[in-house]
Amino acid sequence: MTKYIFVTGGVVSSIGKGIVAASLGRLLKNRGLKVTIQKFDPYINIDPGTMSPYQHGEVYVTDDGAETDLDLGHYERFIDINLNKYSNVTTGKIYSEVLRKERKGEYLGATVQVIPHITDALKEKIKRAASTTDSDVIITEVGGTVGDIESLPFLEALRQMKADVGSENVMYIHTTLLPYLKAAGEMKTKPTQHSVKELRGLGIQPNMLVIRTEEPVEQGIKNKLAQFCDVNSEAVIESRDVEHLYQIPLNLQAQSMDQIVCDHLKLNAPQADMTEWSAMVDKVMNLRKTTKIALVGKYVELPDAYLSVVEALKHSGYANDTAIDLKWVNANDVTVDNAADLLGDADGIIVPGGFGQRGTEGKIQAIRYARENDVPMLGICLGMQLTCVEFARHVLNMEGANSFELEPSTKYPIIDIMRDQIDIEDMGGTLRLGLYPCKLKPGSKAAMAYNNQEVVQRRHRHRYEFNNKFRSEFEAAGFVFSGVSPDNRLVEIVELKEKKFFVAAQYHPELQSRPNRPEELYTAFVTAAIKNSN
């Protein structure tokens, strides 16, 4: 029988529910249990695919092509699993599916209501996420905070699950903030008490509290919360601020969180062996070197827009015993005249993805600086496309060369729309999304980075591609197409072989990086940057 764990939040948003859920998932996985995890987002968008990065941060893409919340990146990195489209559910997605069924007459003339139709659809998503992965345990995080009007159908669905599958198969975990008032010199429990009262008013009694705090929590405070919130005192778990996120699973294990969960759900599983994880954390805490990487992006005011890129750089740094000193460079600020001033102190330069024209000329100048000064450079998605544009302009002398996306009237459309995208008008969910194979060119830097594999599978999110009409001219000038689709139609990786490391990929390698298993192309880039700093 599948066990269901529901993680809710109270008092404030962005309290760390996702990290708590991911950390618990890691502990349960290391007990030998098969775990999956999902995120409920109460916003009305179908998915975050068309949302501004300033609103939502990065869009995380799964193997099967779902555009999802960035928390799924935390889930995959912590638990080291590959999630699917059932792992992210929004209000918009549920309502659109229910309304589509209503239009088809599938409700047989019934009045379609929040209860039971919306809540049934939500419960079906929970069960589908578990069944498609054959999991022993599914952890479901509900975005937002208890009391938000848009969360009510989600919480009602969670309440109903207890009756549907039995109380012994369901556990409710509530995360809250425990503020410390310096003036009073004490922690205040009232916000948590009221949050739990609100949750109980909706019919959900939490079985565990996870309290986010900056200071250590005395046992007396835990006992008080246990008494007023009707949970066992040992089930009041402290989640204190830490230097590195990957410490959190160890901190939760030290408080027997996973054992309490197993006892409640009657899961007979051995103790979690966190030896490898602990060794990784110890290494992270004691890195001996520092490498400066300049990230040239258009959304640098919000680092979450590049969360997976940053984490992938860190992971590759761990493998090289180096901390990553990230220098955020706004692409709008980079010109041919100041590129050396902005980028001259960087050991390596990364140019990540993005959409739209703003900042693209600055990215092109950053790529030009890296090429002309032989600074290790990694381009991702749009960064790969602009690498091709830069080479066309400044090496092949194709004046005005550009991407058709950015300048439809260009004489040299180096990057063009994919053939199967020409007639598509909708923006959401219509890109080339998900896992696709990439055939590597033997002897190339890309092939060496991937240990001379013939083919790798990586996740994509794009609508435009390199225009093959120009391929022969590029190759004649020494531009190497080191990764292509198996049918040789789509360019996946480009590079300049004579440079220390000048490689750009159409796909998003960062989405498959893990703290204890870094992505190979990122690792090759960081390794080259370290050598460049010596």
From Swiss-Prot:
Its recorded name reads CTP synthase
Instruction: Report residue spans for region: Amidoligase domain.
Output: 1-267
Where does this protein hold CTP? 13, 148-150, 188-193, 224
Organism (species): Streptococcus pyogenes serotype M4 (strain MGAS10750)
Q: Which domain of life is it from?
A: Bacteria
Kindly state which keywords UniProt assigns to this record, in alphabetical order.
Answer: ATP-binding, Glutamine amidotransferase, Ligase, Magnesium, Metal-binding, Nucleotide-binding, Pyrimidine biosynthesis
Subunit text: Homotetramer.
* Pathway assignment: Pyrimidine metabolism; CTP biosynthesis via de novo pathway; CTP from UDP: step 2/2
Q: Quote one Gene Ontology molecular function term.
A: CTP synthase activity
Q: Where is the Glutamine amidotransferase type-1 domain?
A: 292-534
Q: Please report which protein family the annotation says this sequence is part of.
A: Belongs to the CTP synthase family.
Q: Tell me, in a sentence or two, what this protein's role is.
A: Catalyzes the ATP-dependent amination of UTP to CTP with either L-glutamine or ammonia as the source of nitrogen. Regulates intracellular CTP levels through interactions with the four ribonucleotide triphosphates.
